Amino acid sequence: MPALRKHPQTATKHLFVTGGVVSSLGKGLTASSLGQLLTARGLQVTMQKLDPYLNVDPGTMNPFQHGEVFVTEDGAETDLDVGHYERFLDRNLSGSANVTTGQVYSSVIAKERRGEYLGDTVQVIPHITDEIKSRILAMAEPDAAGVRPDVVITEVGGTVGDIESLPFLEAARQVRHEVGRENCFFLHVSLVPYLAPSGELKTKPTQHSVAALRSIGITPDALILRCDRDVPEPLKNKIALMCDVDVDGVISTPDAPSIYDIPKVLHREELDAYVVRRLNLPFRDVDWTEWDDLLRRVHEPQETVRIALVGKYIDLSDAYLSVAEALRAGGFKHRAKVEMRWVASDDCETEHGAAAALSDVHGVLIPGGFGIRGIEGKIGAISYARKRGLPVLGLCLGLQCIVIEAARSVGITEANSAEFDPKTPDPVISTMADQRDAVAGEADLGGTMRLGAYPAVLTPNSVVAQAYQSTEVSERHRHRFEVNNAYRDRIAKSGLRFSGTSPDGHLVEFVEYDPQIHPFLVGTQAHPELKSRPTRPHPLFAAFIGAAIDYKAAERLPGMDLPEQFVPVEHSDADAPALEEPLEKSDVRG
């Protein structure tokens, strides 16, 4: 009789997170929080998201359907859950952290065309599942620093029972077979609904969801019960019995006040200890030092500031998820609570509309985006804030709108972006040379932007250099358009400074007004929100929230008047020639 195959006890462990009953239960946050707990126990953890949609990546998807696109250091356009992973683990992930059906099928079909399958009939099993498995198992390889992860947490997108998810679930089942059951753990997130008329929590949906999972060969090792309240012990015992799961593996996770409370919720239910025990991982106590400090900043703020996010996609807040979290983290830095006001950019197209939307906020953030809709509203919001000394932070498209507004303020009345008006006589924002084919429709749109981390050099003693405490920085990007260098000198007459560029000096990366002209009006072509962490707020967001706190404090001073340079100044077309005067003689500081 052949000997049983032995699996090495030192092998990287694989933990799969699946979801049942309904979508949007918080699988990504559950996986991220468990990853944070294991990391706090001294383990090396990495994470991956399997998305069952046919798109190659979310880069060309509608923000209203998918939410934000999270860009990694290596330039991959990934699911927003990868942002949760990076923030909770406090580590950078690569493009391999997100796998889609589109990627898998593209790879398999390309291999078939090259003849790599040697004439085999290419099928979902084994070819598609093998491709998925190879990407899952590749996560266990050593990283760039040569460190092999102790645990790979893989979130399977979608809901058990969805036809699109079946190949991924089958691949996960086969991974368990290949690495050994002792090296694999399945965590299933399910809904336990509360029926108000009868006053009952119902377990039947969870039972059916687990039955569907078991029908394809996967028995969960633990269950996350999502509910708006604690699930009592008798119901947990019932679910454990009916779903054939250890009672210790039935975890009640009621809604938490903050997403950063979830690790504490899971720890209170001893999920992390159960996982460590089942996977035979080294047991160390959780080091709560850093996370407890974060939670004190979350729940015991000493100040509150109101920030307006002026955007196009505010009907789905997930479209600006990383921006919102970066703003909150900037608040944590100052022990301040950030109240978000979601302002539709269309509402700020007129001065009256901007005043109605922004008159009682302490800062304005202009996020990235694409297309002409709402652009004049973003420019209107910047103009309103510039004239009143209201702190502004512009990201990507936000920088471009700051530049357009500055150009118009010094008489370049037709200033616009080639993206919004290809025939504008004054394209102060122009198409990047290597992006012209894509913009003209002669090349693929997906995956062709300027993506990933790029360096920038900052002007010494500038606002941004002081925020970063450095003159050399690296930020992630996602854009096709740039500031037109032919207009730099004319735009500079507004007082706007080009305070950061690419190392060769060609590409404008940061703009700002001198603090004597405006206390904090800064734009960056990058997406700094993607590098912010709750425990390590991004310097630009921390500086922005600090400026908002100062603005609020100045508001409270009795009898305070606006400095002269912040008093709104209107220019007629007849004034335009006078705007060529030296800055100190001009009113264009507005």
UniProtKB/Swiss-Prot annotation:
Pfam families: CTP_synth_N, GATase. HAMAP family: PyrG. Homotetramer. Catalyzes the ATP-dependent amination of UTP to CTP with either L-glutamine or ammonia as the source of nitrogen. Regulates intracellular CTP levels through interactions with the four ribonucleotide triphosphates. UTP binds at S23, K202, T203, K204, P205, T206, Q207, K238. It comes from Mycolicibacterium smegmatis (strain ATCC 700084 / mc(2)155) (Mycobacterium smegmatis). ATP binds at S24, L25, G26, K27, G28, L29, D81. Mg(2+) binds at D81, E155. Its EC number is 6.3.4.2. This is CTP synthase. GO terms for molecular function: ATP binding; CTP synthase activity; glutaminase activity; identical protein binding; metal ion binding. Residues 1-281 are annotated as: Amidoligase domain. It comes from the Bacteria.
